[in-house]
Amino acid sequence: MKSLWLDIGNTRLKYWITENQQIIEHAAELHLQSPADLLLGLIQHFKHQGLHRIGISSVLDTENNQRIQQILKWLEIPVVFAKVHAEYAGLQCGYEVPSQLGIDRWLQVLAVAEEKENYCIIGCGTALTIDLTKGKQHLGGYILPNLYLQRDALIQNTKGIKIPDSAFDNLNPGNNTVDAVHHGILLGLISTIESIMQQSPKKLLLTGGDAKLFAKFLQKYDPVVETDLLLKGLQQYIAHYPKD
């Protein structure tokens, strides 16, 4: 069976086409706040793939999701938008109001949560998200500005400091302003993760664009980097979705 999986974020649209659980095509593109228009440009390509179903993770509002739904109707196959539930597939949501939890975080937790295992799941994307699980119970988590948001905020709110692009590659004290900024921001986020990891034993799992960078500084916790974690969560969601 061929399936199309869509991850529609605030700035990017990612898609995977799988056949018998194997990824046969994957792409990610900036959608410039118009994901429906980007999807419209891909629809003919999708139409020739012999797809059987579509699973979607979307952070968009209802109006934009409805536009996405209308475009995908042209493929004439079942479409499922993943949602956050108080309980799903045995996983208990840790939020008081489940709908306030981001669907991307929910799917990442759904992908890995299992009985008798505790996880710390770090999403290294536009924001740094941290979710904790104890068995099949989601415990909630934390959201922090990522490396680049912190740097940009510092630039915008500090007169007289010009900070060019530079690698976040070191935790040592900076010997110049550029290094002091980059090393300080990275140290702050790494220290936050370490503080959480030291509270109780748990497996550390990293996903997102900067996952490998963070893993480099967290080696003592034996981090696992999962590049397609959201896809796995979306597949898990569809596997437990009620059949008509």
Swiss-Prot record:
- Record: residues binding substrate: 95, 102-105, 177
Q: Which GO terms describe its molecular function?
A: ATP binding; pantothenate kinase activity
Gene responsible for this protein = coaX
Q: Does the keyword Ligase apply?
A: no
Location(s), subcellular: Cytoplasm
What organism does the record attribute this protein to? Acinetobacter baumannii (strain ACICU)
Give one Pfam family.
Answer: Pan_kinase
Coarse class of the protein's main subcellular location: cytoplasm
Cofactor, how bound (note): A monovalent cation. Ammonium or potassium.
InterPro entries hit by this protein: ATPase_NBD, Type_III_PanK
Oligomeric and partner information:
Homodimer.
**Entry keyword set:** ATP-binding, Coenzyme A biosynthesis, Cytoplasm, Kinase, Nucleotide-binding, Potassium, Transferase
Q: Which parts of the sequence bind ATP?
A: 7-14, 126
Full protein name: Type III pantothenate kinase
State a GO cellular component annotated for this protein.
Answer: cytoplasm
Known catalytic reactions: (R)-pantothenate + ATP = (R)-4'-phosphopantothenate + ADP + H(+)
EC assignment: 2.7.1.33
Similarity comment: family membership: Belongs to the type III pantothenate kinase family.
The record's NCBIfam families line, in alphabetical order, gives:
baf (TIGR00671), PRK13322.1-1 (NF009856)
- Enumerate the active-site residues: 104 (proton acceptor)
Instruction: Indicate the enzyme's highest-level EC class.
Output: transferase
